[in-house]
A protein has these predicted regions:
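Sec-dependent N-terminal signal peptides
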Residues: 3-12
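Local sequence-structure signature of Cys/Sec-based thiol-disulfide redox active-site neighborhoods
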Residues: 16-48
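Short glycine-/acidic-enriched loop or helix-start segments at secondary-structure transitions
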Residues: 34-35, 58, 81
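Extracytoplasmic/periplasmic, Sec-exported soluble proteins
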Residues: 50, 61, 89-93
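N-terminal post-signal-peptidase region of extra-cytosolic proteins
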Residues: 51-57
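Structural micro-motif
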Residues: 61-72
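Non-catalytic, surface beta->alpha helical segment in thiol-disulfide oxidoreductase systems
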Residues: 71-109
């Protein structure tokens, strides 16, 4: 029974991770020091997903570089920022995210 509940919870999380405004960081355990803190965006849906746990998810989202951050709005990809060959996100990643989120919020009204 616990396994069924755990699987159901995991499925719901996957379905909901792109709801409304969501900031999703795709990464790997060995890159923890290269990730950015998503605390600034805590009023939105934020998730950090590790490749070792959800390989299929990475394939479905066509993640080519780590780390990668994707901003979604109601399931639509708005912005994708990745670390490229250097495995390091650009210095202005947080600014890019905030700019796009501000635009999304302005367009809601």
């Amino acid at each position: 029974m616990k396994l069924i509940i755990a699987l159901l919870f995991t499925t719901l999380t996957f379905v909901q991770f792109k709801d409304d405004i969501s900031v999703v960081q795709f990464s790997a355990e060995f890159l923890v020091d290269k990730q950015i803190s998503l605390r600034k965006f805590k009023q939105f849906n934020t998730h950090t997903i590790f490749m070792s746990e959800y390989k299929k998810f990475f394939a479905d989202e066509k993640i080519e570089y780590l780390p990668t951050i994707i901003l979604y709005n109601n399931g639509d990809e708005i912005l994708r920022v990745h670390g490229g060959m250097s495995l390091t996100l650009p210095e202005d990643t947080v600014k890019q995210l905030q700019k796009n989120i501000d635009e999304l919020l302005q367009n809601k009204f």
